[in-house]
Swiss-Prot record:
Functional note: The RecF protein is involved in DNA metabolism; it is required for DNA replication and normal SOS inducibility. RecF binds preferentially to single-stranded, linear DNA. It also seems to bind ATP.
The species this protein was found in: Chlamydia trachomatis serovar D (strain ATCC VR-885 / DSM 19411 / UW-3/Cx)
Protein name: DNA replication and repair protein RecF
Family under the similarity heading: Belongs to the RecF family.
Main location, first listed in the record: cytoplasm
Subcellular location: Cytoplasm
GO cellular component terms attached to this protein's record: cytoplasm
Alphabetical UniProt keywords: ATP-binding, Cytoplasm, DNA damage, DNA repair, DNA replication, DNA-binding, Nucleotide-binding, SOS response
Gene it is expressed from: recF
Domain of life: Bacteria
GO terms under biological process: DNA replication; DNA synthesis involved in DNA repair; double-strand break repair; SOS response
Binding-site residues for ATP, renumbered to this chain: G30, L31, N32, A33, Q34, G35, K36, T37
Translocase among keywords: no
Molecular function per GO: ATP binding; single-stranded DNA binding
SUPFAM superfamilies recorded: P-loop containing nucleoside triphosphate hydrolases
């Protein structure tokens, strides 16, 4: 995928903006609070239908305006597409090539964006649900079927938990079948994704830094290195049977992919406890790069990589190493308060001041 242009109307501090992006590195710099991150937020909203900065999209409507409008023109496999979203107090309207999209599950994957920001620290320092969400978003960008599978799993889980609270053993048993079917598939896909991501991650990490890094999916349903889907389903059935009495006592389902964990270690030690802030941010940046490579190698999907406030997250040495890696990832958009010095014939540099974006280099696109 290549993003050709981005149009903003009454979004954050932008009244009216049309921005043309270069095919590879796009570096956006300017002082704080000028609108740099707003550009990445707009791209992210187009990708997932939600913001990484607020839970309410109406917060992004420019002060005094009634709605905001975002539109991107992009190419995928040499076919041009238009994706837009309009948000007002009544809700949002999403159009893909003029046709309405009514479900976010239909949107995810159409305009793939991988975002690296300082808020990614939650993947390391947050609860296991943050790491499960990381895997789920990656898999959802790869396949809309995954979104359907995990949605059906959570529906079955909610129904089973309601049956547990009602102490209805017949209903509990009835919901075990869909729970096992969808839950086993979710655990299987997450595990396979993690193994492939780990291989890519280690390769990228070895090219930049010397520490030993590892990603591992930890699940009570997975008891061997390369389980089949049937192996996981059999384990799930047995564990639900064993945990039935305890589930009734506690009032909820104890086992399943909703309890799983993605373990991140560096030199065989937990990253969250034994890594410096610099190591954590470097790890997260490489993890985002690994996502891009995973989507490219496994699904022939070329996402847009967005990196926010890179000089605040990374020291210059680590940043230089990572930017060298980014050259092979396709289209990239970065923001910083510092004017970049990685100028080349394939990079575009933009300056932002008071919601005005000007092209610094090259002179024209």
């Amino acid at each position: 995928m290549r993003v050709l242009s981005l149009f903003l109307k009454d979004f954050r501090n932008y009244t009216d903006l049309r921005l043309e992006l270069g095919p590879e590195m796009n570096s956006i710099f300017g002082l704080n609070a000028q609108g740099k991150t707003n550009l990445l937020e707009a791209l992210y909203i187009l990708s997932l239908g939600r913001s990484f900065r607020t839970s309410r999209l109406t917060d992004a409507i420019r002060f005094g305006a009634s709605h905001f409008f975002i539109e991107a023109v992009f190419s995928h496999k040499e076919v041009f597409h238009t994706l837009s979203i309009q948000v007002d107090k009544k809700g949002k309207k999403i159009l893909f090539d003029g046709a309405p999209i009514t479900k976010l599950s239909e949107l995810v994957g159409l305009f793939p964006v991988i975002l690296f920001s300082i808020k990614d620290i939650a993947i390391i320092e947050g609860s296991p649900s943050e790491r499960r969400r990381f895997l789920d978003l990656l898999l959802a960008q790869a396949s809309d079927k995954y979104t359907e599978h995990i949605s059906l799993y959570h529906k079955a889980l909610d129904q089973r938990n309601a049956s547990i609270k009602a102490q209805n053993q017949k209903a509990i048993s009835a919901w075990n079948s869909p729970l096992i079917a969808y839950g086993s598939l979710v655990a299987f896909l997450r595990n396979e994704c993690t193994k492939k991501l780990n291989t890519i991650f280690q390769t990228l990490w070895d090219n930049t830094l010397k520490e030993t890094l590892s990603l591992r999916y930890e699940s009570s349903l997975i008891t061997e290195e390369s389980p089949t889907l049937n192996d996981i389903a059999s384990n799930y059935y047995e564990q639900l049977r064993i945990a039935n009495t305890k589930d009734l006592d506690l009032g909820y389902t104890m086992v399943g992919p909703h309890r799983d964990e993605l373990l991140l270690t560096i030199n065989d030690l937990p990253v969250a406890k034994f890594s410096s802030e610099g190591q954590k941010h470097s790890l997260l940046a490489v993890l985002r790069f690994a996502e891009c490579v995973y989507l490219q190698e496994e699904f022939c999907i070329h996402p847009l990589l967005c990196m926010d406030d890179i000089h605040a997250c990374l020291d210059q040495q680590r940043l230089d190493q990572l930017l060298q890696l980014s050259n092979s990832l396709g289209q990239v958009v970065t923001t910083s308060t510092i004017c970049p010095d990685h100028r080349s014939t394939t990079s575009c540099i933009f300056h932002v001041t008071q919601a005005q974006v000007s092209l610094v280099a090259p002179q024209s696109l």
